[in-house]
């Protein structure tokens, strides 16, 4: 499960500045979700190749009424669901009563908490943070979020220790791997593969969407149609429920973020919406069903969730619910709006259903399996290189400083989403338009549907880079004789 980091503190201590600095590395989508405090933000960030979800909880005002009553309900939820809490204070303003009230609350939660003193630029860090030791939260990490000073040290000392259980990816010699696989394919041999068999694993399916769009109804319709005994399999400490099921002799695991239990236990008309659960479900899923209310249309919140799904690289099926009862004229208007606002998602299937009455629900699984198969499909290095060569023959890369960008070969870089790694010279100078052309060419050639595809470029190493051209003693003597001859001839 992707770790969650919550930024907590008084207003104007620099939480949003640190949030923007952390999430900028991933160019993360920052979204304000209706129904929460207006300044709450969520984003994806990365440290040394390891991803985490970052939450700006907004300002917490610890007044005489008590910090617990002044905290927004969703801010409390974010703290409870976080793996690590970064408690930020203002080093310039000094220790405030609100800081003490917040610290008292955090100590009572027994949550891993680290004290971060911001705005230490221009100050003696040791003197600036001395008063904050009275909060009893241990070591203090001085930073200047606006300039980035101390942020890297903070990440290394706080976040990385909590991610040690995530095994680092092994570095491989990609050139050697390419030629070994290419030679095996040329000789008619099977290229060596690992033990990963996507068809032997259950498909993890997350159903996400805004409150009251019908996620619970759709989940229960799916389970009810299959007449499966529903039991709650422990998922995470954050109360996401993993529900195993089977359909057409294929195993699935529904990731339930709406708190749905057995049919008889559903009493609330409106689903309890947890942004954290939704984001984590997206990260943990293989395929995401994004449910949209046909009667309300596409909202900014729908687009925010969609952006997070795309950034996560997950396979996607768009489900337009509550389709029944709409007039033909309204249906045409909804379809036009979908085409206009979702025109950039040309790889995702769109289904119009009624979860309440069950119409169209059965067809969802065909698209789910198609998306999963596309995202986990094995493609040989030779085939990817051939496709790349055909793309270059159809449309040459542009000239860069008078020289043509050269693409050498391509190989698989990962799955879910499928990643194609292209090696070449000057590839970092390729314009975005040509990168999009290559992505679309690979998608069309591989017939990838239901999942995004990513293209990564790697520059070929120059063995003479950073080396000086020094002459040998023999070359030096020859050069002197040549220079003398040139001078005499003049």
Curated annotation (Swiss-Prot):
Keywords: GTP-binding, Nucleotide-binding, Repeat, Ribosome biogenesis. The keyword Nucleotide-binding applies. One of its GO terms (molecular function) is ribosome binding. GO terms for biological process: ribosome biogenesis. Residues 377-461 form the KH-like domain. Residues 3-166, 203-376 form the EngA-type G domain. GTP 2 binds at residues 209-216, 256-260, 321-324. GTP 1 binds at residues 9-16, 56-60, 118-121. It comes from the Bacteria. GTPase that plays an essential role in the late steps of ribosome biogenesis. Associates with the 50S ribosomal subunit. Belongs to the TRAFAC class TrmE-Era-EngA-EngB-Septin-like GTPase superfamily. EngA (Der) GTPase family. This is GTPase Der. It comes from Salmonella typhi.
